[in-house]
Each structure stands twice: as structure tokens, then as C-alpha cells.
Design a protein with these regions (language model features):
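Ubiquitin-like/PB1-type beta-grasp interaction modules and other compact soluble beta-rich domains
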Residues: 1-94
């Protein structure tokens, strides 16, 4: 069963306009899932990860409803059929 990435509007130019991307076969960690996403859409990588391979501070990634910052980061387990959401931070003011 594939996993599904939900792609935010700002990154869809790198996925051919796709709002969702399915990865199959299912990877076992977030790092593996992201590597599979980057193989399909290499332009996404620099927007999500630093040169050291870490998730950028202004990017939140959720596996289901859990923010990976609190579940093990790139080592977070990924189950078959799960949905992964990439959510850039939004800020504003007056």
C-alpha cells in the first residue's frame, strides 16, 4: 500500500502541479520516504532540506497528525498507507 505526500501550493511547481504524490513501495522511515520523493521530484529537496540533509526550520512535516519534530525527525517510522503532509510555516503581522 503506497504512502501519500500532500504537497503545499508553493512546491507544486516542482511536482508538475500535483497536490499529492504517491510513493510505492512504502518506505519504513521518513528519510526513506523523502528520498523517494526527491528521486521523483528533485526540485523539492532544496526547499525542504538543508545542505546537511535536515528538515528546514520553517518546514513542518506531519505523518498523519503527528509533527515529526516530536516523533523522531527523519528516523520517524512510516507505515504503509500513511499520509505525510509538508507544511511551510506561515507568519505575518501588521
Amino acid at each position: 500500500m503506497p504512502i501519500t505526500f500532500h504537497i503545499p501550493g508553493g512546491l507544486r511547481e516542482f511536482t508538475g502541479g500535483r497536490s499529492t504524490v504517491e510513493i510505492d513501495p512504502s518506505p519504513t522511515t521518513l528519510a526513506d520516504a523523502l528520498a523517494a520523493l526527491w528521486t521523483l521530484y528533485p526540485g523539492v529537496r532544496d526547499r525542504i532540506a538543508t545542505e546537511q540533509g535536515q528538515v528546514r526550520e520553517h518546514i513542518n512535516i506531519f505523518i498523519g497528525v503527528e509533527n515529526v519534530r516530536y516523533t523522531g525527525g527523519l528516523a520517524s517510522p512510516v507505515a504503509a498507507g500513511v499520509e505525510i503532509s509538508i507544511v511551510p510555516a506561515v507568519s505575518g503581522g501588521h
